Amino acid sequence: MLLLLFSKTVRRILAVLVLIPVVVFGATAARVWWVARQDDRPHSDAIVVLGASQFDGRPSAVFKARLDHAAALWRDGIAPRIVTVGGGRVGDRFTEAEAGKRYLATVGVTDVVAVGVGSDTLQSLKGLSELYKRQGWKSAVLVTDPWHSLRSRRMAQDLGITAATSPTRTGPANDSRTTELRYVARESAAYLYYRVFHRSSDAGPRAV
């Protein structure tokens, strides 16, 4: 009898231990999905475009979608300037930030600051926070893909920036339900990784 009771207790404990991470991941995925659908546009010190792949100064489709959205926000008077962020790889002639700045100039944006550091989101935002400290800026509207919004906002806030997100609704990250589900799953894992280790999990090839 005691052995049977012990066995049932162990099974219940194991079930709870299995269920907890499932619930945590599910709740995080719901937050990623919810924040992805929000479009916050408070008047801010700057509109910040998070970097993505560029090819010899030409923004990839993902990056171009972000830049076009940021330009539209700038024309609407959301902020007096746009800041592009993102470093480069060995052999690149341009950083992501520089490529973004060059592109924005071609579409008529007259005040762009390039912060060409960082090979992942956290490193780029650390570079941004240094610029903010030097300039005395406080607030930002972050422009990125919808599923990246929660994690990038959390990182910026942890670095002392009052951050809102206005994600792009165009580009490859928004092209199908399958793509959306894949990004939600990936970003949920990346967000949890950041909250536990306070490190970025997205070092490596940028989105194209």
Where are the regions a protein language model picked out?
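Enrichment for repetitive, rod-forming helical segments
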Residues: 18-19, 38, 73, 158, ...
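N-terminal type II signal-anchor transmembrane helix
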Residues: 2-39
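A structural signal for short, hydrophobic/glycine-enriched beta-strand patches
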Residues: 29-185
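A transmembrane-helix-recognition feature enriched in membrane-embedded lipid enzymes
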Residues: 177-204
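Extracytoplasmic/luminal low-complexity segments enriched in Pro/Gly and acidic/polar residues
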Residues: 207-208
